[in-house]
Amino acid sequence: QQTPTGLATTGLETRQYGTSTTSWSTNDNVKHYANGGLDAWDPTRYLNIWVCNLSGGLLGYGEFPTASVSQTFGVVIDYPCLGSNYTSYGTFSGIQAPFDRGRTVQHAFSHCFHIYPLWGDDNGACSGSDLCADTPNQGDATSGCFAYPHTDNCSTTSPGIMFENSMDYSDDNCLNLFTNNQKTRMLAVLNSAPYNALQTSNG
């Protein structure tokens, strides 16, 4: 692993002092040193992730891909939602249940690879789309962890909605899958310029 200047690195950069900001919003200030955050490393060579005290009840957010890579490309994660308490490394008191299995990062980075929310952002109208034919129509985000099958106003009969899909807002212990169409969309981004450079990066 190397920094943009070729030095050995763990991939971690921290900034705890020299800023009066105690929480951050979705205005991307956390992605700029001049605004109290940290500048991105070359986004064609690194997948950037900013971890901070994110305000407004948000767990995290990701930036969608564009024809030319934005210098802010990456994800922002609220610090209690980073990491997992279910690995061989043990448990960490700062990670908050029920978002303690790393699914927030997984969900946010999926946006970077062109995956949309299951419900199509149509406010329950059942007319929106996530552009994946193999995900059931869904009215809105879910929370908690339902028993299977679970129906809603857009998928009224069994098997209902796919609340286990990583692009829903269910608890981390529920989120365990992507569909083939979602995989195809992600690979299409990763295999196309300029994002394909990430596959051969020495970062």
Give, region by region, the residue ranges found by the protein language model.
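Metzincin-family zinc-dependent endopeptidase catalytic domain
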Residues: Q1-C145
